[in-house]
């Protein structure tokens, strides 16, 4: 197991983001585990999470010029990763909304 993988699992368990048991997923499927990304926000060790994400991107040799974070929980993950990736090169973030606002610019993608 790689160092970043171990750190991610340890963080997930400490933050109680990774749970084991009998869960019904949004899709209706049964699962022996559940991952609640919001628990990572509440735990407050987001820099560790961002380091793990950056290590995985580097390991896989991924190249991109923007990071997309799907609403809502994906927005904070994309922002964290972009912040870490921006240490060497500017990395913009975009995200969507689940609903179009009827005020401002009325955009579904930001």
Placement of each model-derived feature along the sequence:
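PRPP-associated nucleotide enzymes
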Residues: 1-109
